[in-house]
Curated annotation (Swiss-Prot):
InterPro entries: Ribosomal_bL33 (IPR001705), Ribosomal_bL33_CS (IPR018264), Ribosomal_bL33_sf (IPR038584), Ribosomal_zn-bd (IPR011332). This is Large ribosomal subunit protein bL33. The keyword Transmembrane helix does not apply. Keywords: Ribonucleoprotein, Ribosomal protein. Belongs to the bacterial ribosomal protein bL33 family. GO terms for cellular component: cytosolic large ribosomal subunit. The keyword Cell membrane does not apply.
Length: 55
């Protein structure tokens, strides 16, 4: 079977709480780093989440 093009990534909270979401992204169509506003349940606010690699 062929290797999939989608890469697993981690979206880490910029609030510094350590909270993160995991998702996948197509590295061929979106080579830049993802930045999304999502809800951080630790601070109970919508904050910016930035892409980081899953180790």
């Amino acid at each position: 079977m062929a290797k999939g093009i989608r890469e697993k990534i981690k979206l880490v909270s910029s609030a510094g709480t350590g909270h993160f979401y995991t998702t996948t992204k197509n590295k061929r169509t979106k080579p830049e780093k993802l930045e999304l506003k999502k809800f951080d349940p630790v601070v109970r606010q919508h904050v910016l989440y930035k892409e980081a690699k899953i180790k």
